[in-house]
């Protein structure tokens, strides 16, 4: 990968001038001037996904200039570097190969002179065998009963991805009940343990190093709870498995290392659901559906790595995001899935995007003077409409939104889905075109009211519109289409990081807080007043000690 400051390119300068021409152009004008706008600014993927980006403040010239930026920053070279196994995570000297985990073509992918695919396939096969034993009931707990509940203990990528996918694919789930514990707050593990039976529960401890503070604290609490019933430590092996690479620590915990599922340092945590970290997904929906998830992602990988940039969906969405973030000053993006099963999708890509591209230092080690990662947030529709859409429609912030919905629902109750989708379509239309003063006044006249007498209310009912959105319509949310959708967003994030000259695959920002917490923890062990920090931190710690006494 080349280290090119995007603001120093001629394409960036051209975009700055173009922004001056575009800043007052409205989406309504763009549609009025081009009857073929939807056809020009939308694309389908495998007849499974329609991406409509026509309701954006862009023209063909805008996209051409953004594509020039991608060329000048050598995006094509960056894509080749990632897929070829080059160590593009330079601060940790690691390759970035989540694409290898779903490489259904089995084409060799070389890291340090070694094809990684045989090991990837071996772990997949091991997960298949293990999961089939659990799901079939062949695997027995310490009293001879089959497993009924699975508790995944992890945090960050070891929790968010599997939790999001098992929820999104709930229509495909089997008889096993899944639980996820992440927070070191004891309430989280305590509430889950109230729901499960030690005789029929399997715990998955997801920590690459088997040293993650939150995960291991919860794992030891789960082990202690289990042993209160099981008694003999030899029974731990029948109820705990590890997603880790630290065989020594796994064995010391009491887990049979035959039930340790490894992954590699070229798998980043927030890109790890495709790896052994996805074992909870397999246990929830079955191995065949997990393979479909991998296959959908692999199909998007092929699209991303082979499709010309002008028709490449992750690249197009990434470029539009850069346009708003760096030229319009939009600091945020909302992800709004109109599907209740997808209720964790925004939270998943909140981590995926903000931990990846929330960087202020470029690949040369210099502070940037432009915008990098946006703030990502969102909730399912239509809940959000009754919560925060007010600000999106009439607030002072520009909030570009991604609306996501399936054409076919898994629960065709009455006319629920038509009502849901009517809102999905209506919101993007309302955000784009708004409602003028003239329309508001005409509505009053149609109701037999005199607009002049209601003059004081009219301004509050006007919608400026011109609020940008993308619409992603899936045929149906299946393991395959979900895999493709996740990979679409992953590659969008990678594209933005590559163009913005930052390292997308490290996360040093999480380290300082950990270090300070490790320093503070021993100070909380007694009731002595603390004076070793700033006055605020000292005051907080000392009040905590006073109140807990």
Swiss-Prot record:
Q: What are the annotated GO cellular component locations? A: cytosol
Which BP terms in the Gene Ontology apply to this protein?
A: gluconeogenesis; glucose 6-phosphate metabolic process; glycolytic process
Q: Where in the cell is it found?
A: Cytoplasm
Could you tell me which pathway this protein works in?
A: Carbohydrate biosynthesis; gluconeogenesis; Carbohydrate degradation; glycolysis; D-glyceraldehyde 3-phosphate and glycerone phosphate from D-glucose: step 2/4
**Alphabetical list of CDD domains matching this protein:** SIS_PGI_1 (cd05015), SIS_PGI_2 (cd05016)
Q: Which reaction does it catalyse?
A: alpha-D-glucose 6-phosphate = beta-D-fructose 6-phosphate
The reply to whether Cytoplasm figures as a keyword in the UniProt entry is yes
Q: Give GO MF terms, alphabetically.
A: carbohydrate derivative binding; glucose-6-phosphate isomerase activity; monosaccharide binding
- Its recorded name reads Glucose-6-phosphate isomerase
Q: What's the source species for this entry?
A: Salmonella schwarzengrund (strain CVM19633)
């Amino acid at each position: 990968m080349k280290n090119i400051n995007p603001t120093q390119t001629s394409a960036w300068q051209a975009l700055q001038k173009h922004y001056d021409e575009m800043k007052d152009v409205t989406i309504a004008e763009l549609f009025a001037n081009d009857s073929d706008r939807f056809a020009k600014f939308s694309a389908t993927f495998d007849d499974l996904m329609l991406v409509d980006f026509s309701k954006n403040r862009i023209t063909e010239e805008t996209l051409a200039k953004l594509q020039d930026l991608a060329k000048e920053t050598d995006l094509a070279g960056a894509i080749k570097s990632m897929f070829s196994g080059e160590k593009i995570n330079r601060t940790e000297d690691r390759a970035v190969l989540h694409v290898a985990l779903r490489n259904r073509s089995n084409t060799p992918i070389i890291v340090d002179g070694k094809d990684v695919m045989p090991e990837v396939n071996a772990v997949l096969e091991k997960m298949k065998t293990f999961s089939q034993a659990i799901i079939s009931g062949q695997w027995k707990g310490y009293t001879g009963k089959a497993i009924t509940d699975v508790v995944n203990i992890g945090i960050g990528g070891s929790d968010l991805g599997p939790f999001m996918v098992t929820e999104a694919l709930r229509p495909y789930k089997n008889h096993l009940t899944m639980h996820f514990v992440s927070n070191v707050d004891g309430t989280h593990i305590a509430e889950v343990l109230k729901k499960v039976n030690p005789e029929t529960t399997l715990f998955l401890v997801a920590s690459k190093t088997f040293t993650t503070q939150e995960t291991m604290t919860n794992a030891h609490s789960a082990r202690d709870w289990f042993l209160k019933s099981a008694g003999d430590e030899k029974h731990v092996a029948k109820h705990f498995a590890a997603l880790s690479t630290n065989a020594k620590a796994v064995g010391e915990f009491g887990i049979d290392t035959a039930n340790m599922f490894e992954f590699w340092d070229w798998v980043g945590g927030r890109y790890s659901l495709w790896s052994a970290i996805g074992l909870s997904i397999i246990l929830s929906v079955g191995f065949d559906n997990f393979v479909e998830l991998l296959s959908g992602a692999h199909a998007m990988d092929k699209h991303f790595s082979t499709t010309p940039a002008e028709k490449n969906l992750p690249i197009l969405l990434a470029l539009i995001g850069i346009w708003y973030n760096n030229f319009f000053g939009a600091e945020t993006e909302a992800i709004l899935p109109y599907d209740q099963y997808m209720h964790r999708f925004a939270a998943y890509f909140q981590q995926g995007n903000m931990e990846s591209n929330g960087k202020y230092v470029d690949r040369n080690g210099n502070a940037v003077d432009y915008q990098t990662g946006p703030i990502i947030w969102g909730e399912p529709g239509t809940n959000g409409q009754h919560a925060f859409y007010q600000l999106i429609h009439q607030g002072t912030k520009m909030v570009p939104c991604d609306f996501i919905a399936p054409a076919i629902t898994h629960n065709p109750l009455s006319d629920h889905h038509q009502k849901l989708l009517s809102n999905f379509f209506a919101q993007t239309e309302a955000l784009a075109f708004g409602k003028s003063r003239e329309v508001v006044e005409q509505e009053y006249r149609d109701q037999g009211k005199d607009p002049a007498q209601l003059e004081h209310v009219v301004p509050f009912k006007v919608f400026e519109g011109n609020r940008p959105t993308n619409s992603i319509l899936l045929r149906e949310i299946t393991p395959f289409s979900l895999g493709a959708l996740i990979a679409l967003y992953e590659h969008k994030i990678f594209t933005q990081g590559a163009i913005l000259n930052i390292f997308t695959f490290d996360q040093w920002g999480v380290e300082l807080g950990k270090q300070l917490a490790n320093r503070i923890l021993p100070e909380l062990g007694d009731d002595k007043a603390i004076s070793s920090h700033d006055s605020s931190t000292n005051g907080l710690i000392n009040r905590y000690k006073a109140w807990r006494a």
